[in-house]
């Protein structure tokens, strides 16, 4: 039996969540990292809405968004590892922000953010005047984000449609009902999503995206390895220090033999560009320190375009 087999899963068919529990709570953790980055001296990204969304979930979450990472003052190694995790979140966010900017520059005015969580791109990016952004996620997660931002007078920078549906269900039908136009090229985003889907659901997701995509559509994907050790350690510290009881390892699917995302897309008509997260972190001035290499998360960041007629 492998270490992966020994982890008891907290997931079940048809499970759901609010923003402070299960998979939903990981969106708060990611938003906290964006808040930390935004408060830095030379931020790679700016998300002024992240602190609002995180602090509204309670004082423990607000502490997690503390740019000084004061809750780890007596743990220098933990503080460095957490800072590295925030750097990674900043780099992947920057990658996807640039992706949407390039898509808009190419005349693509329809975007779909899968498992949107507390993603605020519909509010904070510079969208073309006719842009339409669809956000797909669990109903209570979308409701939390919309209510908090509305209560602070925040309005979207594009026409935004929240599509409240589980990605394991018939989300294409819900997307079409919300006004999605399958004849227009689309910029798709699957960021921080794939580990929370079973392998067969990941394949179906890509099949549905491809079926809904007009020529010239694009997609950006964050593809994970099965080794999430560094990420696990960060979440364990959050639990132990802040009382945030999140077992991220038990929330992800780690079955062997999952289809490689880049390979699947390339085999189905997409032209794929990929870069390792560590290469991208080094390029942007956030390299992984040598003594933290074994604890750092490893992912591949993908961009792909669909140029052929099917």
From Swiss-Prot:
- Pfam families noted in UniProt: LCM (PF04072)
Which Enzyme Commission number(s) are listed?
A: 2.1.1.-
Keywords from the named record? Methyltransferase, S-adenosyl-L-methionine, Transferase
InterPro entries given for it?
A: Ppm1/Ppm2/Tcmp (IPR007213), SAM-dependent_MTases_sf (IPR029063), SAM_mthyl_Trfase_ML2640-like (IPR011610)
Any one GO biological process: methylation
Q: What species does this protein belong to?
A: Mycobacterium ulcerans (strain Agy99)
Member of which family? Belongs to the UPF0677 family.
Q: Where does S-adenosyl-L-methionine bind?
A: 137, 166-167
Q: What is this protein called?
A: Putative S-adenosyl-L-methionine-dependent methyltransferase MUL_4763
**Protein function:** Exhibits S-adenosyl-L-methionine-dependent methyltransferase activity.
Q: Which GO terms describe its molecular function?
A: methyltransferase activity
Recorded hits in SUPFAM superfamilies, A to Z, give: S-adenosyl-L-methionine-dependent methyltransferases (SSF53335)
Highest taxon in the source lineage: Bacteria
> What lineage does the source organism belong to?
Bacteria, Bacillati, Actinomycetota, Actinomycetes, Mycobacteriales
């Amino acid at each position: 039996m492998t270490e992966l087999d020994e982890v008891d899963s907290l997931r079940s068919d048809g499970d759901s969540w609010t923003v402070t529990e299960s998979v939903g709570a990981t969106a708060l953790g990611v938003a906290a990292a964006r808040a930390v980055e935004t408060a830095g001296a030379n931020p790679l990204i700016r998300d002024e809405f992240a602190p609002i969304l995180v602090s509204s979930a309670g004082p423990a979450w607000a502490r997690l968004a503390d740019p000084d990472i004061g809750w780890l003052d007596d743990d220098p190694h933990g503080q460095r590892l957490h800072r590295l995790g925030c750097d990674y979140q900043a780099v992947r966010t920057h990658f996807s922000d640039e992706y949407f900017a390039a898509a808009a520059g190419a005349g693509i005015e329809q975007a779909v953010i899968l498992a949107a969580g507390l993603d605020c791109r519909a509010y904070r990016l510079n969208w073309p005047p006719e842009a339409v952004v669809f956000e797909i996620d669990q109903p209570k997660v979308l409701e939390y984000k919309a209510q908090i931002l509305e209560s602070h007078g925040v309005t979207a920078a594009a026409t935004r449609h929240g599509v409240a549906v589980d990605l394991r269900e018939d989300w294409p039908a819900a997307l079409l009902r919300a006004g999605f136009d399958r004849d227009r090229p689309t910029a798709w985003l699957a960021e921080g999503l794939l580990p929370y889907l079973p392998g067969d659901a990941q394949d179906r997701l890509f099949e549905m995206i491809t079926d809904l995509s007009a020529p010239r559509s694009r997609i950006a994907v964050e593809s994970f390895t099965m080794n999430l050790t560094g990420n696990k350690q960060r979440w364990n510290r959050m639990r132990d220090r802040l009382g945030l009881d999140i077992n991220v390892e038990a929330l992800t699917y780690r079955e062997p033999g999952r289809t490689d995302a880049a390979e699947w897309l390339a085999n189905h008509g997409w032209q794929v560009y990929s870069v390792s997260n560590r290469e991208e972190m080094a390029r942007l001035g956030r390299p992984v320190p040598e003594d933290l290499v074994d604890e750092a998360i490893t992912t591949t960041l993908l961009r792909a375009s669909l140029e052929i007629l099917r």
